C-alpha cells in the first residue's frame, strides 16, 4: 500500500516544530505539533488536528532538540487525537530544514555519504546545523525505513554573483575553508517568491522583490527575476540585521576589544559542538535582548516604549532594515513589484512596517493605515497593504511564510509527484 504522508521538521535553538502533510501534488496539513521553551524551561507541547487543539506544560525534562523530537514522535504516534492521522507506517518522507548547506544547491537525500558531508559543515555553523543533524540522525535510528531529505536555507542564494559572494581576503584560504557569503532564510524566501508571484499572477522568473524575513533572526533579500542577487546574511546568519540575541553587522575587530578570550572555546561548547567565545557573545549575548532584557519584540514595538533602551532597540532595527532596502532598491534599478514583510515580526508588527515604510517613502512606498494595522487574516497567505487611491505608489505586501509547507511542496517536486 502506498505511503501517504510527509513529515516536515523545523528544529530551532529553542523549539522543534513538526507538520504532517498529505503526500499529494499540493500537500495539505494533516496535523501540526511543537515543543517550545527548550532553553527556558518548563517546555510546552502543543498540537492541532483540524479543529482540535491542545497545549500543556511538560513534566518531562526537555533539554535538547532531539529530546523534543523524540517526545513529539511519541505523542504523535500514541495520542488518541493524533495516532489515527499521524502514523509512522504512512510516512513517505521526512523533510529537514538545515540552515547551512555549504555548496549544496538543491535538496539532498540522506545516506551515509551525504550525512558525513553535512557533518563537515558543522564547523561553519555549529549553532545552527548541530540540532538539525542530531534529529536527522535520530530519524535514521527511530524511523529507518523512511527516507530523510534535507532542505537548505542557503540553497536559494546559489545565484549570488561572484562580486557579491566573494570576501576580499586571500582566495586560497577562502576556498580551502569555504569562506564566502552564503545567505540564509532561503526556504522562506522561496515560499515568499512563489506566493507573491502567484498573488500577482506573474511567472516567478519575471518577479522582482525586496523581501524581508523579520523574526528573532532577521534578514533581507534582493530578488531579481526570480533569483537572489544579494542578501544581508553572509558566511553565517550572524551577518546583516540584528536579531533577538544576534549583533548583526559590526566592526569585525570589535569582539577582540570586547574580550581577550574571543578565540577560546566558550563554556557552552560540548564534546560534539565547538563554539568560540566570540561566536557565543555575538550570537547569544547581543541583539535587542541585551538592550532591553527581552527577546519579545512585541514588548519593544509599542507606541509608548517602557524605556529609552526599548526605543533604541526599535530604532536600530528600523535603521538597519531601511539601509538594506535602499541598497537593494538601487541594485534592482528600482524595478521591483514591491517590498514584502514576512517572519513572525514582519507579519505581526504593524508599527515596524509603518516605521520602515515611512522612512522609504522617498522611493515611492506607502501603506494604507487600516490595512497595515489589520494585517493578514489566518487564511490569507499574501495581503496587499499598499496605500490606495494613488497610481504612482510602490506596492507593499505581507506574506505569512511557511517553511514547513515549502519543504513538503518541494519534496513532491523532487520526487516527481507533481508530474504524475
UniProtKB/Swiss-Prot annotation:
Enzyme Commission code(s) on record: 2.7.2.1
Cofactor(s) of this protein: Mg(2+)
Biological process, per Gene Ontology: acetate metabolic process; acetyl-CoA biosynthetic process
Residues engaged in binding Mg(2+): 10, 403
Metabolic or biological pathway, per its Swiss-Prot or TrEMBL entry: Metabolic intermediate biosynthesis; acetyl-CoA biosynthesis; acetyl-CoA from acetate: step 1/2
Gene3D superfamilies: 3.30.420.40
SUPFAM superfamilies for this protein: Actin-like ATPase domain
GO molecular function: acetate kinase activity; ATP binding; magnesium ion binding
Site (Transition state stabilizer): 185, 246
EC class (word): transferase
Catalytic activity: acetate + ATP = acetyl phosphate + ADP
Record's keyword terms, sorted: ATP-binding, Kinase, Magnesium, Metal-binding, Nucleotide-binding, Transferase
Binding site for ATP: 17, 213-217
Pfam families found in the cross-reference section: Acetate_kinase
Binding residue positions for substrate: 97
Catalytic site: 153 (proton donor/acceptor)
Family as reported in the entry's similarity comment: Belongs to the acetokinase family.
HAMAP family: Acetate_kinase (MF_00020)
Record's protein name: Probable acetate kinase
Amino acid at each position: 500500500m502506498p505511503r501517504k504522508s510527509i513529515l516536515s521538521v523545523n528544529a530551532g535553538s529553542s523549539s522543534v516544530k513538526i507538520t504532517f502533510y498529505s503526500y499529494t501534488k499540493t500537500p495539505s496539513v494533516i496535523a501540526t505539533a511543537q515543543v517550545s521553551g527548550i532553553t527556558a524551561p518548563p517546555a510546552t507541547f502543543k498540537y492541532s488536528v483540524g479543529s482540535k487543539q491542545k497545549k500543556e506544560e511538560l513534566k518531562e525534562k526537555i533539554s535538547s532538540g532531539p529530546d523534543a523530537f523524540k517526545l513529539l514522535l511519541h505523542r504523535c504516534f500514541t495520542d488518541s487525537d493524533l495516532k489515527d492521522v499521524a502514523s509512522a507506517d504512512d510516512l513517505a518522507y521526512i523533510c529537514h530544514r538545515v540552515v547551512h548547506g555549504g555548496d549544496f544547491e538543491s535538496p539532498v537525500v540522506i545516506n551515509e555519504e551525504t550525512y558525513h558531508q553535512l557533518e563537515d559543515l558543522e564547523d561553519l555553523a555549529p549553532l545552527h546545523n548541530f540540532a538539525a543533524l542530531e534529529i536527522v540522525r535520530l530519524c535514521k535510528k527511530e524511523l529507518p525505513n523512511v527516507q530523510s531529505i534535507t532542505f537548505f536555507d542557503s540553497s536559494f542564494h546559489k545565484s549570488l554573483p561572484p562580486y557579491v559572494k566573494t570576501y576580499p581576503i586571500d582566495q586560497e584560504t577562502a576556498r580551502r575553508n569555504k569562506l564566502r557569503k552564503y545567505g540564509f532564510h532561503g526556504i522562506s524566501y522561496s515560499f515568499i517568491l512563489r506566493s507573491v508571484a502567484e498573488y500577482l499572477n506573474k511567472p516567478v522568473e519575471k518577479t522582482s522583490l525586496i523581501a524581508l524575513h523579520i523574526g528573532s533572526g532577521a534578514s533581507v533579500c534582493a530578488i531579481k527575476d526570480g533569483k537572489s542577487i544579494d542578501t544581508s546574511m553572509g558566511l553565517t546568519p550572524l551577518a546583516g540585521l540584528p536579531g533577538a540575541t544576534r549583533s548583526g553587522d559590526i566592526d569585525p575587530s570589535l569582539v577582540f576589544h570586547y574580550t581577550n578570550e574571543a578565540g577560546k572555546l566558550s563554556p557552552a561548547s560540548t564534546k560534539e559542538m565547538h563554539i568560540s567565545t566570540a561566536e557565543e557573545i555575538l550570537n547569544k549575548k547581543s541583539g535587542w535582548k541585551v538592550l532591553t532584557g527581552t527577546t519579545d519584540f512585541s514588548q519593544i514595538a509599542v507606541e509608548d516604549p517602557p524605556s529609552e533602551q526599548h526605543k533604541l532597540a526599535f530604532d536600530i532595527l528600523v535603521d538597519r532594515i531601511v539601509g538594506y532596502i535602499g541598497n537593494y532598491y538601487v541594485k534592482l534599478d528600482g524595478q521591483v513589484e514591491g517590498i514584502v514583510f514576512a517572519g513572525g515580526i514582519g507579519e505581526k508588527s504593524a508599527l515596524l512596517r509603518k516605521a520602515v515604510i515611512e522612512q522609504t517613502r522617498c522611493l515611492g512606498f506607502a501603506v494604507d493605515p487600516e490595512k497595515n494595522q489589520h494585517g493578514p487574516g489566518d487564511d490569507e497567505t499574501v495581503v496587499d497593504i499598499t496605500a490606495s487611491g494613488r497610481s504612482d505608489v510602490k506596492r507593499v505586501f505581507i506574506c505569512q511564510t511557511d517553511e514547513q509547507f515549502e519543504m513538503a511542496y518541494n519534496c513532491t517536486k523532487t520526487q516527481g509527484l507533481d508530474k504524475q
